[in-house]
């Protein structure tokens, strides 16, 4: 299958993920539980990552595991800005934009210092409220960052993570 066809299928699956992974509500305790779930997976699998769960106005959870770097926290910030701007998964935008340089097209006027075209940011969509924040992971290849977030969010909201997972690249 051609790369473009693979991307189209993955984009379709990510859209299904975004439509299925709706939180009934989200508070500080929910964010801690979700963040801890991601951290537990990372520790078990020996993944060096940074994790951020934030609403638009404040951070609710942050953690880093062994192997994460200072750069990962900067990637978290830049991915958060992308979710805030577009209200969709950052990996979906990576596939839609199809740019090797991880920068948005110049006409978007988004400074690379503040916006990263990289997977791992996922919108927090609350039933009846819309997108209110983002869950972000940084430290793995971008598709793996995305898959880790989707797995944890799916488990958290009672969806089947296997049915929602992207196929291996």
Swiss-Prot record:
Protein name: UPF0303 protein BCAN_A1444
Listed NCBIfam families: PRK02487.1-2, PRK02487.1-5
Family designation: Belongs to the UPF0303 family.
S-S bridge residues: none
Domain of life: Bacteria
Transmembrane intervals: none
A Pfam family of this chain: HbpS-like
InterPro entries noted in UniProt: PduO/GlcC-like, PduO/GlcC-like_sf, YBR137W-like
Organism: Brucella canis (strain ATCC 23365 / NCTC 10854 / RM-666)
SUPFAM superfamilies membership: GlcG-like
